[in-house]
């Protein structure tokens, strides 16, 4: 502490000369270095002073530029070490502000040069912490923040001083190690905690009931918070991103402490940002972001996409108020005219309006008109007369002002007498205060005795502080070896708990000692400071009154002197009249010279305009030639790549090729229009260049799409398409070559290009998949037809089931009748459920069309969404077909000629088809739609009905098989052995057939997916759709 005080003592010279390490070099370099050090010394002393006002930005900026100039902070620290930072709190506060700016925006070596002063900053922080009022606590907390910032950037050198990093740099800082990210998050929490403590302490020290942000003292305390706001915005953003990354790698319970600490800091930061944004001081300097209403939910990974990084905006500086408005030419002309009228009026006032008929006007008597000089003389006489009148008015006005000032002086003399009376009272109070001051001095001597008795306590406190430093170093060691501590959790937990307990004991002892010292020192200083402040305020008021009296006396002397000045000005005006007469002739000579110079300038301007027009024409021609050559190069490269191997792995589609051909046709029309406009107006070349460039790129795309489409086409169409693409490329090159000369439109004929495009379009339409043969305008009608046909098929199937049930009741009895009734009843329930599903699907489709078509018709909506429409058509067909097949299978089962397995398979197929219909309907539906909920409920009803059909079929099959059990009672051993062998042979045959049938089923499904993909508009080259509900149920069985 003593070392810090001695190194920062004040020297008599307010601008100390910095001792720099100069080498023996050229005298010029030494002079430059000395000038730099002098400039830095002046700026640092102006930025860091004892006045309670905010640091001026220009002085801080000069300090920042100085660090970049010398690539370090040696000059800054050499000047700061001479300032009494430990004896003046305002000086220390402004030092912290400037040093914070240097750490953020200065040269990176500022941190390295400042590390040697870490201990001095810590000692100064502890010293200022003993003061509970004024800037003491503020300086203590700010110094702790700067110490934390230096330690953080020392441990994490990847973070710059201003904390501006990209997401990739943030990931690199953690080296892709979860332990590093864990430790980095803890350090960011500590860093942000120090920032928030300073923020909160500054606000608590201000009286928020008044407009403190517009006072100089309030701005002095609020100015450093701009740097704090910038740091807090970045730290909050990085903390959120790191916590999301940790939650993706570690369990949520492990990070519970991180989340609790983040919630606490989030609440504080949000409140401080809101309070800061309402202060008038910050509104004109910085735009403070507002945090979201609720904190991020780290347990939901998708919440990271909702996070918006807070951005602090510092507006550009306003224009200088010193700039003067520039008068326009018309305003100057009006001013000259008004002055001319003023001169005329003043001349008439002096010589009279009949001056032209004066007997001394010889020109008028002789019949000769007055020349310009006579007019000028007349105007000057009028001006002199006006000035005399103005002078008389000013004399009158000055006399009135003098009388007012005399009255004001009388009032001030009365105020002065009152002030003298108050001064006498203040002198009496001062005597009383001196008596009390003597008493305080005696008390102070007693206090010094008490302080000497506390020296032993301070030595003990220093010993305890040394123990605390050792424990803190041990704790830092433990944090750095975090990974080892995780493996030895039990032993380390015990050690950390012991260290924390010891630290708590030391902190308690240190706090008790600090409180006792603070109470003893404050009691003596508080009364002395209050009395001195009252005496100083009285002296300042007296000095202010004396200064006002001197100003008033000076204004009286100025008024008397102004009268003498007016007389001198009148004499000067008479002299100026004579000079104007001689100057008029000189101006006529200058005017003739200027006219001649104007003619020469006009000739030069005409020749320059002609040369510039020619130059612009040449540049436009060069630009057109360059654009055409670039377009030809793009097309030629596309033609050269037709045979290159990389295209083998790029399979294209015919619809992409046709889309590109359509775009080329439109581009050719636009190019012809642009060419016509260019021939009519050569200055407008932008549209022509754009059209040429667009045609080149579209042609390249068409050739590439044609080459990739050939890879999937049959050999003969592929060869034709390749040849057509080549011919189109050559025709395009020829067309572009015809644009080189500025001829008529006949030189650039696009007929050959259009023919090649027509040929490519015809081949592409032949290569389109069969599923796209339906005209888009017919899709809407086809959807309605297929849905109606499906409903009709369901109603027909229901009627047939009722008919079969009636026949079975009439012709069957016993177990067979029971089985048939159960199966047919479940089939009837299934058909009813399907009918409800179709009605719900129609309602949902109608809602989708009404909400999505806008002003278009339903047919136009279906045509616009053709692939979705084709999916609906396919699903409707599948439902109707499945219902018909199931009824046929049920009829055969009832008659005894069918298999129960066919009925189960048909049920599964109907369930899969209805699921496809539901999925196709849900694609464009609103998730909150009531019709969608009804459709999903109907789908669940279909699934339940399908399960009922399968269950009844299995039950009926088991009942019938129980009646057909074999009777082995009458068979011999040989017969049983024979039938056993036959059964084994049959089992082997059935297993072989089952294997072959499964392979056949796989091939059928593969082919079905391919055909379904083409029919429903699936993208070529994609995988097959997921298996249907029927396939899933079959595999489970």
UniProtKB/Swiss-Prot annotation:
Gene Ontology CC: clathrin-coated vesicle; clathrin-coated vesicle membrane; cortical actin cytoskeleton; cytoplasm; cytoskeleton; cytosol; glutamatergic synapse; Golgi apparatus
Tissue and organ distribution: Ubiquitously expressed with the highest level in brain. Expression is up-regulated in prostate and colon cancer.
Coiled-coil segments: 368-644
pDED: annotated span: 410-491
Domain I/LWEQ: 771-1012
Region (Disordered): 1017-1037
Entry domain remark: The pseudo DED region (pDED) mediates the interaction with IFT57. Binds F-actin via the talin-like I/LWEQ domain.
Subunit (UniProt): Homodimer. Binds actin. Binds HTT (via N-terminus). This interaction is restricted to the brain. Binds to IFT57. In normal conditions, it poorly interacts with IFT57, HIP1 being strongly associated with HTT. However, in mutant HTT proteins with a long poly-Gln region, interaction between HTT and HIP1 is inhibited, promoting the interaction between HIP1 and IFT57. Interacts with CLTB (via N-terminus). Interacts (via coiled coil domain) with AR. Interacts with AP2A1, AP2A2, CLTC and HIP1R. Interacts with GRIA1, GRIN2A and GRIN2B.
Disease: A chromosomal aberration involving HIP1 is found in a form of chronic myelomonocytic leukemia (CMML). Translocation t(5;7)(q33;q11.2) with PDGFRB. The chimeric HIP1-PDGFRB transcript results from an in-frame fusion of the two genes. The reciprocal PDGFRB-HIP1 transcript is not expressed.
Name this polypeptide is given: Huntingtin-interacting protein 1
Species name: Homo sapiens
Lineage, uppermost ranks: Eukaryota, Metazoa, Chordata, Craniata, Vertebrata
